[in-house]
Amino acid sequence: MKIVIAPDSYKESMSAQDVAAQIEKGFRDVFPDACYVKLPVADGGEGTVEAMVAATNGRIVNVKVTGPLGDNIAAFFGLSGDEKTAFIEMAAASGLEQVPAQQRNPLLTTSYGTGELIRCALDHGVEHCIIGIGGSATNDGGAGMVQALGAKLLDASGAQIGFGGGELDKLASIDIGELDARIKKCRFEVACDVTNPLTGEQGASAIFGPQKGATDQMIEQLDNALGHYAEVIRHDLDTDVEQVPGAGAAGGMGAALLAFCGADLRQGIEIVTEALGLDEIVRDASLVITGEGRIDSQTIHGKVPIGVARVAKRYDKPVIGIAGSLTADVGVVHEHGLDAVFSVLYHICSLEEALDNAAENVRMTARNIAATIKLSQGLS
């Protein structure tokens, strides 16, 4: 019997690797001779680098980059085991958590550090970059990123503009003569689970600006600046990105990756499961187990359990979900490939207690599921 264990992390509690390990422990108590394949998974957001590195026997590369406020910060990216693919999280270099709440101002914050991460990855000779762009602190249209990669964003006098979304209204022309030539030889895939355009009522500034510290006045200024930026890109690069779905992701980073890197914007879970070769792994499985911190009606929107289930159902495999908690509307997940779902919580308790006992609760839940499966085999 082959059992594939492919969970996401339980946010603020357990990594995907730890969840998978505890599920295996529980099942081994009942099925000691089964073949277990543990495959930590992520949806393109937090934890993606660690999950992809673990699954490909790769490594983490620690680097110093320019933070959102222009200071020097510690960041990281991942390399696959064959060192042909880089795994990058924008949040590691240009994330909201890098900026204290009282200093959040998207007129000033820059994505320059994300460009430095990409440049470091190219220095390692990668042929493929997978970039997660969630959790950003910026609204600069990815301008900082492309500046780090060699593009010159020039004002009317021919001087380079500064950092931050507030500088984009000064942009007069774009010179890509010194843009890193290695970009053309690298395939860029962007984990992007939003479809917002660059500008407008559903654009980057209006929808995501407030969480980055933007006031109503800033939102209007930033939206106008991004519109101007898009017009210069259209004129100088002959590329229209303003209303492309996903262009507004991460404060317009989606637009920059499209225009300057020729990136493909895709659902994060699709990129991850494809890169991990999940199809081939589950093809001959007897059972697939997945999970995340909470399984609810939102799980069907690009989350790991449904992404894993969709792959498994291509081969008619049974799928079980194990979650920290379930909600009353969880039934909808059964229509999307999860055959059964279980919570690891056995009684009403505080969040602190639930987090403290998470590992043992996952193991015990997995053991009970395995025992139930074994009983059912005997009954049949």
Which residue ranges define each predicted feature?
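N-terminal loops that bind phosphate or other acidic moieties
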Residues: 1-133, 137-380
